[in-house]
């Protein structure tokens, strides 16, 4: 059986993903590849990024931009900018 993700680690990964997208200005015109999102997360938590990213998409904070020739790309939902800025601060 696999390791479970604690609530604190879940929030850390969530904040890290949103911060990275926000700092790279990945809004309506920009996007960020999956590999770039996972690069700042510790190796023992890297397996949980997909789970957290799926939850962010369900919440509507992150949008799946599409597949590029380099991999999956993601961007922030501009309509939920206030919620995103609350999470970051």
Go through each PLM region and give its residues.
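Short amphipathic alpha-helical interaction segments
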Residues: 42-58
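Short alpha-helical segments that sit at the start of domains
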Residues: 1-24
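Short, amphipathic alpha-helical interaction segments positioned at domain boundaries
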Residues: 78-89
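A short, conserved structural fragment
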Residues: 57-67
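Minor-groove-contacting beta-hairpin "wing" of winged helix-turn-helix DNA-binding domains
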Residues: 68-76
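Short acidic, hydrophobic short linear motifs in intrinsically disordered regions
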Residues: 27-41
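Alpha-helix N-cap/helix-initiation sites
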Residues: 10-11, 27-31, 46, 67
